[in-house]
């Protein structure tokens, strides 16, 4: 989804009855679902999404055929996509045709492209974690406020992060959703449930939302 009205489609913010304009942290393509953090702080968006900060985003993925050790090994090591090679990442098989993957970068449609390169097609992709924020306790289509403890921990994790935009090889020409967000300062996202940090409603509005289709 997006915060822009494109092709007369409903945007994620249309579902929120909220007085301030908020933006999703990161993107999920239209076919994906899962956790989404909404905020009105562009600097927070940039710190979380900037690839150089190496912050984790975790996904649950189902593919069209059985996963084997070679698939897990090659996905973990890095796969050529978009004129670059993806960073080494953690991949754990969870079922015959499913796995969890933890990324620290956000190339355009990265997981789908990685799987396709290895001869697989993604059937379901769900983001289940952004840094310390998870979907735990949030049902399909719901959102909640970030707790004070989550907000404190998030800020601690971001202490040494920079919000500066740095374009790297293979992350130019719109290939990286991380940098698309950095250039926009909090541009767009797709997903479903949301959270706001308790006690920060006046100035720092954060929601964690998750789109489940």
Model-derived features with residue positions:
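Phosphate/adenylate-binding "loop-and-lid" substructures adjacent to NTP/NAD/dNTP-binding pockets
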Residues: 171-213
């Amino acid at each position: 989804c997006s915060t822009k009205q494109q092709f007369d489609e409903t945007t994620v913010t249309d579902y929120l009855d909220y007085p301030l304009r908020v933006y999703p942290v990161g993107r999920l393509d239209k076919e994906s679902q899962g956790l989404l953090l909404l905020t009105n702080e562009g600097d927070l968006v940039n710190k979380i999404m900037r690839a150089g900060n190496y912050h984790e985003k975790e996904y649950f993925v189902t593919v069209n055929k059985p996963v084997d050790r070679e698939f897990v090994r090659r996905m973990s090591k890095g796969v050529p996509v978009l004129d670059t090679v993806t960073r080494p990442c953690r991949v754990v098989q969870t079922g015959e045709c499913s796995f969890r993957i933890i990324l620290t970068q956000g190339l355009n449609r990265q997981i789908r492209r990685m799987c396709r390169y290895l001869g697989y097609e993604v059937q379901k992709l769900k983001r289940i974690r952004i840094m310390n924020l998870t979907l735990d306790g949030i049902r399909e289509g719901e959102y909640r406020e970030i707790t004070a403890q989550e907000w404190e921990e998030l800020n601690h994790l971001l202490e040494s992060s920079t919000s500066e935009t740095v374009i790297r090889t293979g992350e130019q020409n719109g290939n990286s959703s991380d940098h698309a967000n950095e250039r926009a300062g909090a541009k767009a996202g797709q997903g479903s449930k949301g959270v706001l940090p308790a006690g920060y409603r006046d100035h720092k509005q954060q929601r964690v939302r998750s789109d489940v289709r």
